[in-house]
UniProtKB/Swiss-Prot annotation:
Keywords: Ribonucleoprotein, Ribosomal protein, RNA-binding, rRNA-binding. GO terms for biological process: translation. The gene is rpsT. GO terms for cellular component: cytosol; small ribosomal subunit. Binds directly to 16S ribosomal RNA. The keyword Methyltransferase does not apply. InterPro entries: Ribosomal_bS20, Ribosomal_bS20_sf. This is Small ribosomal subunit protein bS20. One of its GO terms (molecular function) is structural constituent of ribosome.
Amino acid sequence: MPNIKSAKKDLRRSRAAAVRNRAQRSALRTAVKKARVATAAAADHLTAVSLLDRAARKGLIHRNAAARVKSRLAKQAAASAA
């Protein structure tokens, strides 16, 4: 356990951020799974893409990881539409 006041505050902030990040990452994964399962639901695809962009912008996931998932979702959506 930290003894210094600033270290205690840093630990509090770190724990709060971890909880927040866990919730956002869970919502992101859920949206991506819904988009994969949905055959022709454009709304699910757009929601997943929006969440991926936001997560990459905030540093929750790497921007290349977001681009990779978006690319695979688009490829799958195009294949199911054709």
